[in-house]
Amino acid sequence: GWQNTDENSTHSIPPTTARFFRFYWTPEGSEPGSEDMDAAKWKPNLKIKELRLHREARLNQWEGKVGLVWRVAQATKEEEFGKQDCYSLSQVINLTKQYTGHSNGKTLTATLPKGKWKLLRMGHTATGHTNATAGGGKGLECDKFNPKTVRKQFDNWYAQAFVKTNPEIARRVLKYMHVDSWECGSQNWNKRFAIEFQKRRGYDLMPYLPLLAGIPMESVEQSEKILRDVRTTISELVVDVFYQVLADCAKEYDCQFSAECVHYQKVDLPMGEFWLNSPTHDKPNDMLDAISGAHIYGKNIIQAEGFTEVRGTWDEYPGMLKALLDRNYALGINRLFYHVYVHNPWLDRKPGMTLDGIGLFFQRDQTWWDKGAKAFSEYATRCQSLLQYGHPVTDIAVFTGEEVPRRSILPERLVPSLPGIFGAERVESERIRLANEGQPLRVRPVGVTHSANMADPEKWVNPLRGYAYDSFNKDAILRLAKAENGRITLPGGASYKVLVLPLSRPMNPEPVLSSEVQKKINELKEAGILVPSLPYTEE
């Protein structure tokens, strides 16, 4: 899902002069929720803590565009404000030296040109997020852009197992290091960010720093471009620093690196997650991220944290679990992690230790433990033993685009691009679902009310009617993809006959290709790769 709650939302509107303003809202037209539209999963209503009108222009949804929060939004429109509302570089004076150069470091003394000036003070601090499941080691999240702080977190955490015990025994026993789901918000700065930005993007970010407060500069188009570069730099640093340092640490201790989230280039064992009887919390995007990432980067073992549950009601049984597990095996995973098998030290307490109501209760005090748990586990083991020897056959590579952040593409988001493959019946049912007429609700599980028109994964089995697809990122297109015998081939062994460049969707509202990506796609087309015109309507 998306951690979309850390910041406010700013909506750009055309300049308007009035004494009184009235805003209307209606649930009509509200799209049903999905994993790329979390807030829409619930009953459509509007609760406002504060509505503030600005005297000056602000970039549309700038909080997400500057990387304060994971959020995707349309670019600010020229009609919302023009060039006259954007500050030029000549209107900005950097007073940092006058401030930091003062004897006490707290006083600003400067002589400014005549006129009215607005003073903007900018600094940086921790995000405020803590490592919530750390027990006695709880504290602020580390700086993900600094290799020293990442290494320090590792040394004071996982590496302590090799310090507090016999290191030789620890090396024989501890063979895996796992980083679980990303639940630490978003970081958009550190002491070296501007240096890394200039090295990676080729220009100095500091003159444009007011953009990080949503203040437009030069032009709307220029402002959006620079902030896209900011988000790209954030994304690269998370991979090149945080995940790379941890990957190096794992190798140092002879461990395989297992991880959830979307940085599978650096990990040995990608992992997704699927939920049991919990539509509002299910993670089809997580599953497709891990599966596509594993295929792209040649990782044969694809894991899943399975049977997480938002409110356990003690009605689960192996038959229910098997159907859900089979669907995810068919999707592409081949190693299951049970959520949850809690260590239970008591012999005289029933049901013993649980993880509150979160997750399947899978341990010895489950009522059907002696009746079906062993058979179910052995079934999963047999399936995985065969699946791990297999190799995926995938027909279509679907480009995820160049928006940041970006994730794998859910099948329902491909219907407008490939109506001929989905078929008329699916196109019509999707039209009705998205219309969401009357905004119907349902309750599942007990006590959880949400949109009845959500795109449930069980309704999207084999959605392309015999074809399979992987979501292709920019790295795969530019660095890995080659054309051989009419197919896109990757170093890890995957190959694809067709490359699809999807139409606009919520996660990529303006699918514009950069010159380098367009050049590579043209090369692939010239080498015989099929890139169909969209919408593709042939049956």
Residue spans for each PLM region:
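Aromatic, loop-rich ligand-recognition surfaces of beta-strand-rich domains
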Residues: 1, 5-83, 181
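Active-site-adjacent "subsite" loops/lids of carbohydrate-active enzymes
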Residues: 2-11, 74-163, 194-234, 314
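Carbohydrate-binding surfaces of carbohydrate-active enzymes
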Residues: 18-22, 31-33, 45-64, 163-176, ...
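Conserved long hydrophobic alpha-helices within structured protein cores
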Residues: 21-23, 147-155, 396-398
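Short intrinsically disordered coil segments
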Residues: 38-41, 65-72, 136-139, 193-194, ...
